[in-house]
């Protein structure tokens, strides 16, 4: 398994706690009021450095004196001095505070019921755990934002953590929105479809599902069971005859009156009931209808009901464990090992298991399982509606406050609990087993990846083990829809949230000039990097957040999909922006007949390298190259499909209006024409064997 998200690069090296720090007084605190609830759209909280237990914090009158740090004072003294200045201006009301370093990178975001007392606890000269002491030693400034309530502070804290990604907070990674199933209600013939993002379209939403694959499989089975349409409204309105889905019994054909309004409405109601958890009643109804049709010797109708029942059984067989007493809940379980944490999340809705996903949050090794889990759950519901019940494997701090915040967000009561017995405890135990197994696989993959990177450095003679590898490739068909792409890999595997595609823009580019395309891609990528550092980002640029559009991070190794010619084009591109020999380049040429295992490696000013076909380093390089190829081909096909949709069939030589009409009448949609084989195309009236081949090649041309 290659884990998608990657841990952001480490911040600048920390100064030792007993050495001098940079000069300069720390600015005073910023006590701006919060902008209002409309700006607090997150529903979570992160770890507080300490408890809000007032017995642990100094009284207000005992706040530290804000004496300026003496010249040559150590980092701890400078940090405490900066915090003491902030304490003098900090409010005694709820709020959120941010610790900043000399480069104004946010080190930590926290919230407190009494901000003044919380900040005063950091300024104590003794009693800090190592993690907090390290943070204080790097702090030169503190910013404070006041809020009306502690709940509002909790929500704002989580929002800022997700935006700023401070290194001393627990950070949720791979926070991709979850897919839902939507049955629309804004058309007389409702549509079923997969949905991500804001739930703004009228209809019933069912989810979340753990993956898009789970949603797609469920929708396909639901179409077989309930014959609900999945086409767009515009396609629906343009039909004069049923499409292919009607022919294969995955749609009832409401577009052309194959089913009347009451009949289709009943199908939609049954689908809604099934997704709402009333699956037993729906199956009993279908079984009764099947028996009735069979008794009346309507065997074709009985077979249809039989197939619908089989489709429902297929859905439930994919869901695995389905609870008997839990209607709606999310289950969180954490396991820690080797300084890593894994949180496994299971989703149960309408009494059905809708999947699970493993997360690997970034956290300091000193965090306990309860601390990591509390911060994770808090951030998890930033852009997701919470269920009525949240089951946890560990007790977390401020569970009641978090439940209140989620209640405000969701508009219904939210309960957070650690079950002690019964089926709920079994669900948590099952999730914890999955977390332990997922972390075991993660650790094994990480160790393997580390060894591969070390061996790669040895094989290529690199000065150090690469921590960031960028791989470049481009794709086109005779110069059309030309696109370049960059993929990124590191110790944690592929870093997919840093992949980038580059639509080729150069005017006057010779169609199919791969070298010129590569030059353009590399110049655009590295000009951004040079510009970001020239603007004064310095080390901050190297530590930029992975979701930054420009991805201003220096690679340790750049791999080019191509031989000596592509490598020289890459060197020329970098030389043109003053980066001659500042970036390590590697060209990977395919073997004879494109045989895997016979690749040749090229480094600048060195002889070509040929590795044994079974060499793990060669296999690793192949995997990197193939991932870049997969990504760029996908990007190219997306552009090509967009052009095909806009142009339709008119672009195919020899296909005029008559043949176009015949194809659409036979297949129903452009998508079905694209899927058809040459033999299927040849069955259409007026389409010769030569025309069928031409149509097939138009849709299936292989990009370069």
From Swiss-Prot:
Domain UVR, first and last residues per copy: 280-315
GO biological process: nucleotide-excision repair; SOS response
Biased composition (Low complexity): 67-77
Family annotation (PROSITE patterns): GIY_YIG, UVR, UVRC
GO-annotated molecular function: DNA binding; excinuclease ABC activity
Compositional bias of kind Acidic residues: 49-66
Predominant subcellular localization, coarse grouping: cytoplasm
Keywords, comma-separated and alphabetical: Cytoplasm, DNA damage, DNA excision, DNA repair, Excision nuclease, SOS response
Residues annotated as domain GIY-YIG: 92-170
Region (Disordered): 1-77
Localization terms from the record: Cytoplasm
CDD domains given in the database record: GIY-YIG_UvrC_Cho
GO CC annotations, alphabetized: cytoplasm; excinuclease repair complex
Name of a matching Pfam family: UvrC_RNaseH_dom
Superkingdom field: Bacteria
Subunit structure: Interacts with UvrB in an incision complex.
NCBIfam families: PRK00558.1-5 (NF001824), uvrC (TIGR00194)
Family: Belongs to the UvrC family.
Function recorded in the entry: The UvrABC repair system catalyzes the recognition and processing of DNA lesions. UvrC both incises the 5' and 3' sides of the lesion. The N-terminal half is responsible for the 3' incision and the C-terminal half is responsible for the 5' incision.
Name assigned to this protein: UvrABC system protein C
Provenance organism: Rhodopseudomonas palustris (strain ATCC BAA-98 / CGA009)
Gene: uvrC
């Amino acid at each position: 398994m290659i884990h998608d998200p990657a841990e952001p690069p480490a911040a600048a090296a920390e100064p030792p706690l007993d050495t001098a720090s940079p000069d300069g007084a720390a600015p005073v605190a910023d006590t701006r009021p919060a902008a209002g609830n409309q700006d607090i759209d997150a529903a979570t909280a992160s770890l507080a450095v300490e408890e809000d237990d007032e017995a642990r914090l100094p009284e207000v009158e005992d706040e530290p004196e804000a004496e300026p740090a003496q010249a040559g004072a150590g980092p701890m003294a400078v940090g405490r001095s900066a915090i003491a200045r902030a304490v003098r201006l900090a409010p005694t009301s709820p709020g959120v505070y941010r610790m900043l370093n000399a480069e104004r990178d946010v080190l930590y975001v926290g919230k407190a019921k009494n901000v003044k007392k919380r900040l005063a606890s950091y300024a104590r000269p003794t009693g800090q755990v190592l993690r907090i002491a390290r943070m204080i030693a790097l702090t030169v400034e503190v910013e404070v934002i006041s809020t009306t309530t502690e709940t509002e502070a909790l929500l704002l804290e989580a929002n800022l953590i997700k935006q700023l990604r401070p290194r001393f907070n627990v950070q949720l990674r791979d926070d991709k929105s979850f897919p839902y199933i939507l049955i629309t209600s804004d058309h007389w013939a409702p549509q079923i479809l997969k949905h991500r993002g804001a739930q703004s379209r009228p209809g019933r939403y069912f989810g979340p599902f753990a993956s898009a694959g789970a949603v797609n499989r469920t929708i396909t089975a639901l179409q077989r069971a309930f014959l609900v349409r999945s086409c767009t409204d515009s396609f629906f309105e343009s039909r004069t005859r049923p499409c292919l889905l009607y022919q294969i019994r995955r749609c009832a054909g409401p577009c052309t009156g194959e089913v009347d309004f009451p009949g289709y409405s009943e199908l939609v109601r049954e689908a809604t009931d099934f997704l709402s958890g009333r699956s037993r009643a729906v199956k009993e109804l279908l079984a009764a209808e099947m028996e009735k049709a069979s008794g009346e010797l309507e065997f074709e109708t009985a077979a249809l009901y039989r197939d619908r029942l089989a489709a429902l059984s297929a859905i439930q067989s994919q869901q695995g464990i389905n609870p008997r007493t839990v209607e709606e809940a999310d289950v969180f379980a954490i396991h820690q090992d080797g300084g890593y944490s894994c949180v496994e999340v299971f989703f149960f809705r309408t009494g059905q298991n809708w999947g699970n996903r493993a997360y690997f949050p970034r956290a300091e090794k000193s965090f306990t399982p309860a601390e990591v889990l509390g911060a994770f759950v808090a951030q998890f519901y930033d852009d997701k509606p919470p269920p009525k019940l949240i089951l946890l494997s560990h007790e977390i701090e401020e569970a009641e406050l978090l439940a209140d915040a989620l209640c405000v967000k969701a508009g219904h009561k939210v309960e957070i609990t650690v079950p002690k017995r019964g089926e709920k405890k079994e669900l948590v135990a099952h999730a914890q087993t999955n977390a332990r197994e997922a972390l075991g696989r993660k650790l094994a993959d990480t160790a393997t990846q580390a060894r591969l990177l070390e061996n790669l450095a040895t094989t290529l003679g690199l000065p150090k083990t690469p921590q960031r590898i960028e791989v470049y490739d481009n794709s086109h068909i005779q110069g059309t829809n030309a696109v370049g792409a960059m993929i990124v890999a590191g110790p944690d595997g592929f870093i997919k949230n840093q992949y980038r595609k580059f639509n080729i823009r150069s005017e006057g580019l010779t169609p199919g000039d791969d070298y010129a395309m590569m030059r353009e891609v590399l110049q655009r990528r590295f000009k951004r990097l040079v510009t970001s550092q020239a603007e004064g980002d310095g080390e901050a640029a190297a530590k930029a957040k992975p979701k930054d559009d420009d991805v201003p991070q220096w690679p340790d190794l750049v791999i080019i999909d191509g031989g000596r010619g592509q490598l020289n084009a890459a060197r020329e591109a970098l030389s043109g922006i003053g980066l001659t020999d500042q970036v390590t380049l590697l060209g990977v040429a395919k073997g004879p007949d494109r045989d895997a295992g016979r690749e040749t490696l090229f480094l600048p000013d060195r002889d070509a390298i040929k590795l044994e076909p079974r060499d793990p380093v060669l296999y690793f390089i192949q995997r990197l190259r193939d991932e870049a190829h997969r990504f760029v081909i996908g990007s190219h096909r997306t552009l090509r499909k967009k052009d095909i949709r806009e142009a339709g069939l008119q672009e195919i030589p020899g296909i005029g209006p008559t043949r176009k009409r015949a194809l659409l009448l036979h297949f129903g949609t452009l998508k079905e024409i694209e899927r058809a084989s040459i033999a299927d195309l040849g069955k259409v009236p007026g389409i010769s064997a030569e025309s069928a081949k031409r149509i097939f090649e138009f849709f299936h041309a292989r990009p370069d």
